Swiss-Prot record:
Propeptide, residue positions: 56-79
Protein name (Swiss-Prot/TrEMBL): Uncharacterized protein YCL048W-A
Glycosylation sites: 25, 30, 35, 40
Residue numbers with lipid attached (GPI-anchor amidated glycine): 55
Subcellular location, record wording: Cell membrane
N-terminal signal peptide: 1-18
One GO CC term on file: cell periphery
Topology class, membrane: Lipid-anchor; GPI-anchor
Annotated region (Disordered), positions in chain: 24-44
Keywords of the record: Cell membrane, Glycoprotein, GPI-anchor, Lipoprotein, Membrane, Signal
Amino acid sequence: MQIKNIVAVLATVTAINAQVGIEPNATTPNATQPNATQPNTTLPTASVTTTVSIGEAVVNTMAAGAFGAAIAAGVAFLF
């Protein structure tokens, strides 16, 4: 029963991630990466990404509604 609950929460998290545009692996697109002829100092600061866990990202994007609180509580025990 616990496994079914975890699967349901993960499915919901995946659906929410798709809606809010969170990349599950939090990777930076190749276009923003420097190549051999571009040192890091030429990249704008905005291109630096911070890696957070999926759980943190979901909780941070939740609205303060009952549905959001329920999902956030469900995600919290997984992470």
